[in-house]
Amino acid sequence: MSGNEKEGLDASDSDFDPSDEDDEAVDAETETEAEQPADDAEEATEAEPTDDESEADEAAGPQLDEDVMPDEQSEADLLIPVEDYLGAGVHIGTQQKTQDMERFIHRVRTDGLYVLDVSMTDERIRTAADFLSNYEPEQILAASSRQYGRFPAEKFAEAIGARVRTGRFIPGTLTNPDYDGYIEPDIVVVTDPIGDAQAVKEAITVGIPVIAMCDSNNTTSNVDLVVPTNNKGRKALSVVYWLLANETLDRRGAEPTYGLDDFESDI
């Protein structure tokens, strides 16, 4: 399903049916030959802030930002209080903005940082949970190469029964049946389309959908469902993965057993 010129869900404004995924075309520019595990993973080419820089930004963010969503949006409709989103720095974007992410941006701060609309983050977490609840747990793959995304991605997978690959994504994991670590998931969740470019590329090759946590500097042409969020901050990623796990379990009729503290990694 990935590989559309625009984000899959929003390009058509239609509901996604997991049963249709085999009928979707694979991106013509994607390499289709089987890949062997190699020492050099594909390098991301987009410039982005480091995890440490984002951690510093999120620490300063809540004092500067109170206007993080449209006035007509009620705080009562959110999964958690808006103050909790603020405290985690979920709303803090980068100083770069792509056209793909413009619709998820609420405003720009005086220091040049873009502020993401947390009501859209909240909405997309629910939508992503709707999608994931249609899949068998073991057919969901969470992938995160980003430092602060690894621990919450592992906890997310543990909570919902999914598979997980953190750190360097070995080429051929989804495309080379001869590789010992080869797996065949039906959907992939990634922390960052830039850092997790190899996982996204292979998902496109095999024709499975991609849910991605995207910051203001991300492009989304190979993403089927965007969850707009600060995808570099430790606390922000913990909150988003925790909410996504709980909402997915809720739609399965299961009781969440993890608290936010369980998703927060040590610095």
From Swiss-Prot:
SUPFAM superfamilies: Ribosomal protein S2. Residues 1-72 are annotated as: Disordered. InterPro entries: Ribosomal_uS2, Ribosomal_uS2_arc, Ribosomal_uS2_CS, Ribosomal_uS2_euk/arc, Ribosomal_uS2_flav_dom_sf. The N-terminus is blocked. One of its GO terms (cellular component) is small ribosomal subunit. It comes from the Archaea. Residues 10-72 have a biased composition (Acidic residues). One of its GO terms (biological process) is translation. It holds the Pfam family Ribosomal_S2. GO terms for molecular function: structural constituent of ribosome. Keywords: Ribonucleoprotein, Ribosomal protein. Belongs to the universal ribosomal protein uS2 family. NCBIfam families: uS2_euk_arch. This is Small ribosomal subunit protein uS2.
